[in-house]
Amino acid sequence: DVERLQFSDKKVALDFSANALETLQFIGVIAPALQGNLNVRGTVLSLFDQGKSMQEMSQLALDLGLITSDNTALAKTVFKNVFNTTADPDQNLTNALVEFIEQNGDAKFLATVAGLNINVDLVGLQQSGMEFI
């Protein structure tokens, strides 16, 4: 199976059930405004291609300060990122998310939410692949 195509100006990942999908899942949770950035896609994809897990990538994002590590702020930020909203989740949902973070850790929380495929265009990815540089 062909997983990657290379052109003179860009590359296309066709492995929509593996690393390309994880790349978009990860970016969608951490920084959805960067989902269209081909350089960011390429960098993240290369880390997944090197064998990094979603949880390792999530921990890296936390270590680099790419996303807050305060439990309440993390819960609210991820909610806003995934659902593309400026509104905070209601207090009950915030409390449930914070409880998950406290019990499982912030990297596990990010990895779990990323795996939900909420903020990923699966149809577009399957039809045309994921462009990156």
Task: Locate the predicted segments by residue.
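Substrate/cofactor-recognition hotspot
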Residues: R4-I133
